[in-house]
């Protein structure tokens, strides 16, 4: 069995329910199953999993890698200042990059998170795209943007970035509710009070500016959701299924913006035959999905 992200949670549960059906497991960039189900825990799901902290750390690592590359990363001299400038400007105004699109704070953060998540999974360097976008937005903010050039499909800031923002269509909204929100709300224990999201979001935003509000809001739809497992007595934890008895391998990237580097070590402890491998120069969410190996 191979599972990535939430698929790894499914694999961890399945292996405990039906151990005779599996020879081995590979769990790639797994969410922590204990935190995912969260039986009896007072915080919302994404506060328990911690992607706000991991996302900020990955962005910091990206800036450091660019600076370490020197002249090989054309944005190295100004990238941190550019980012801070963009964040500050977006507090009060919308920024438009000619040939690319218009960004408010929410659209920009969605694009940042999406680029860190994907890495190079779409056949181009998402991180180079992101750095170029940050610099372009900073130029717009301070009025030094060059004259616009026609956008092309292979431009550094092009079609891929434009796809990262904007309101979802009705069909896409319904699809997300059925394939993401319904699963999350049915699986995870969530607090019954909506104030729990406000408090968790404020705390996460204070620790990881730009990422806290984004991530904690992702499961706020579960508050009041009729199928939500929001009663402690109805919540199931991964420990209720026993241990993983088959051999299993846990993979993680050192620069994973969703589960972090140390998630693999936690998941390895779910059974006596687990091993963890961390790719020290691995980026994005998913080791095998983005790997050329």
Regions found by a protein language model. Name each.
Residues 20-23, 245-247, 272-275:
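Loop/turn elements at helix/coil->beta-strand transitions in domains of secreted/extracellular proteins
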Residues 80-242:
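Alpha/beta-hydrolase fold active-site neighborhood
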Residues 277-283:
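Short glycine-rich catalytic loops that host catalytic nucleophiles or stabilize transition states
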Residues 257-262:
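Conserved alpha/beta-hydrolase "acid-adjacent" motif
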Residues 3-13:
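Glycine-rich nucleophile elbow surrounding the catalytic serine of serine-hydrolase chemistry
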Residues 243-244, 249-252, 256:
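Short beta-strand/loop motif that positions the catalytic acidic residue
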Residues 283-293:
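Catalytic histidine-centered segment of alpha/beta-hydrolase-like enzymes
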Residues 13-78, 128-159:
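A catalytic-pocket lid/entrance helix-loop region that shapes and gates access to the active site
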């Amino acid at each position: 069995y191979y599972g990535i992200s939430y698929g790894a949670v499914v694999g961890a549960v399945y292996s405990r329910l039906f151990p005779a059906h599996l020879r081995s497991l590979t769990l790639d960039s797994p969410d922590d199953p204990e935190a995912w189900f969260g039986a009896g825990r007072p915080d919302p799901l994404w506060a328990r999993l911690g992607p706000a902290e991991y996302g900020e750390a990955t962005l910091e690592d990206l800036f450091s890698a660019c600076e370490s590359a020197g002249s090989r990363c054309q944005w190295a001299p100004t990238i941190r200042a550019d980012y801070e400038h963009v964040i500050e400007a977006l507090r009060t105004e919308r920024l438009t990059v000619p040939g690319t699109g218009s960004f408010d704070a929410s659209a920009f953060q969605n694009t940042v998170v999406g680029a860190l998540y994907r890495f190079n999974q779409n056949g181009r360097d998402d991180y180079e795209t992101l750095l170029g976008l940050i610099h372009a937005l900073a130029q717009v903010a301070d009025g030094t943007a060059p004259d616009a050039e026609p956008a092309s499909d292979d431009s550094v800031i092009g079609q891929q970035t434009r796809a990262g923002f904007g309101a979802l269509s009705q069909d896409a909204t319904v699809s997300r509710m059925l394939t993401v929100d319904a699963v999350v709300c049915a699986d995870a224990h969530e607090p019954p009070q909506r104030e729990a999201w406000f408090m968790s979001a404020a705390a996460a935003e204070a620790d990881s500016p730009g990422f806290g509000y984004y991530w904690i809001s992702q499961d706020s739809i579960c508050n009041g959701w009729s199928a939500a497992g929001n009663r402690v007595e109805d919540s199931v934890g991964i420990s209720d299924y026993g241990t993983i008895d088959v051999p299993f391998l846990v993979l993680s990237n050192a620069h994973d913006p969703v589960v972090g580097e140390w998630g693999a070590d936690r998941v390895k402890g779910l059974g006596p035959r687990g091993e963890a491998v961390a790719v020290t120069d691995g980026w994005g969410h998913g080791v095998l999905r983005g790997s050329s190996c």
